[in-house]
């Protein structure tokens, strides 16, 4: 960040980045979070803590300027895939007990985020496999197999399963014809059915889901899904109390500690396990509209991209899916991933506009070729 701000070549484009559609929506969303502190009942420490979690939005325009070099973008994406490769290797070593671990699918943060990032890694590896030739295509294809194995045979995060399926479907529809993509999705469904028959962890997590649903039907809400539903319902009650502005930044955690709405859980909960309910409860309809505008600006701008459009669409779809069951913009490394990947993609846009500006400037200073022609004298 400091090197970008202090380097004249990069810093001259920062104002342009902030003045873009995505730069403005990110800034407005952050400023509204700051403004929402004025009506929050939470202690100042909690308010500042939440403001800090949204501050990553300000990184987006600044980081985008640092990704104007295509080689930098390429190295960054391949660096991410290398990190996912290491993650898969560590996960496999855990699964065969070479590295002792309670949950082999949890390599960093938790199994949900590990599955999220590995599923995205499978998508990116598949994208590069389509775009590459020769040994590189083979290498990326092998990485697709490795990441698929981690998600479907080791990871215990159900979000990862859903994300993997949707991203692979998205990849097919982007890279091949519609008819072939439909056939590919049908084959993907068949693959999931076959994997279910041979994957103990997939069977176990599906069985857990069915058990949770049965427990809910038996009026026992204190299960994995039941807790989430209770958290969502509590966030909904906070939102309905202040539908337009919410209860203010940091208000969810503080209100939960006072009300203790889920006795079996206790009095400490940072978030309602949903970015959408978190936004509605703390910042109301206004905050939700601003969040949708921010995400919408990313999608709209993706249509202007060429090289990195599939990358941005992939992380955007992954974020929107993950936000249903987790507060990933605030309380997850996936929030940083959205910002960094979006910035990487928008670096292409800044590069294009800079090149166009230089080309126009060079054209304007060209001498009039007809000035010395006697016919036109």
Regions found by a protein language model. Give the residues of each.
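Transmembrane signal-anchor hairpin modules in multi-pass inner-membrane enzymes, especially those
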Residues: 1-35, 41, 45, 68-74, ...
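Membrane-embedded alpha-helical segments of multi-pass membrane proteins
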Residues: 1-10, 50-62, 113-122, 161-169, ...
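Alpha-helical transmembrane segments of multi-pass inner-membrane proteins
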Residues: 2, 62, 72-100, 109-176, ...
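Transmembrane alpha-helices of multi-pass inner-membrane enzymes
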Residues: 2-5, 194, 312-322, 328-368, ...
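Aromatic-anchored transmembrane helix interface
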Residues: 22-31, 43-66, 84, 88, ...
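Hydrophobic transmembrane alpha-helices and their immediate junctions
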Residues: 25, 178, 282-317
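A membrane-periplasm/extracellular boundary helix in multi-pass inner-membrane enzymes
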Residues: 175-219, 233-241, 249
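Long extracytoplasmic/lumenal interhelical loops at the membrane interface
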Residues: 218-233, 237-241, 245-283
């Amino acid at each position: 960040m400091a090197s970008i701000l202090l380097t004249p070549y990069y810093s001259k484009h920062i104002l342009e980045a902030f003045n873009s559609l995505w730069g403005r929506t990110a800034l407005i969303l952050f400023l509204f979070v700051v403004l929402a502190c004025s009506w929050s009942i939470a202690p100042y420490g909690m308010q500042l803590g939440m403001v800090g979690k949204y501050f990553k939005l300000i990184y987006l325009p600044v980081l985008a300027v640092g990704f104007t070099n295509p080689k930098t973008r390429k190295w960054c994406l391949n660096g991410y895939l290398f990190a996912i490769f290491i993650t898969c290797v560590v996960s496999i070593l855990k699964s065969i007990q070479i590295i002792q671990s309670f949950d082999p699918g949890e390599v960093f943060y938790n199994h949900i985020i590990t599955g999220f990032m590995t599923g995205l890694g499978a998508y990116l590896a598949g994208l590069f496999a389509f775009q590459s030739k020769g040994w590189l295509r083979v290498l990326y294809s092998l990485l697709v197999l490795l990441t698929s194995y981690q998600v479907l045979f080791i990871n215990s995060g159900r979000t990862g399963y859903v994300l993997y399926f949707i991203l692979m479907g998205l990849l097919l529809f982007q890279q091949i014809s519609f008819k072939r993509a439909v056939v590919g999705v049908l084959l993907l469904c068949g693959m999931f059915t076959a994997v279910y028959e041979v994957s103990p962890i997939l069977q176990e997590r599906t069985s857990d889901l069915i058990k949770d649903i049965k427990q809910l039907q038996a009026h026992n809400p204190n299960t994995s899904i039941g807790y989430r539903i209770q958290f969502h319902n509590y966030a909904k009650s906070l939102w309905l109390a202040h539908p337009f502005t919410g209860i203010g930044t940091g208000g969810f955690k503080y209100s939960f500690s006072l009300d203790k709405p889920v006795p079996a859980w206790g009095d400490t909960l940072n978030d309602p396990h949903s970015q959408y309910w978190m936004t509605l409860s703390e910042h109301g309809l206004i905050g939700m509209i601003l969040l949708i505008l921010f995400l919408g600006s990313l999608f709209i701008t993706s249509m202007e991209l060429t090289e990195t459009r599939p990358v941005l669409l992939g992380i955007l779809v992954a974020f929107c899916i993950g936000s249903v069951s987790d507060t990933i913009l605030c309380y997850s490394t996936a929030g940083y991933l959205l910002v960094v990947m979006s910035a990487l993609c928008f670096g292409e846009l800044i590069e294009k506009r800079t090149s166009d500006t230089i080309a126009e400037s060079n054209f304007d200073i060209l001498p009039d070729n007809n000035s010395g022609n006697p016919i036109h004298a």
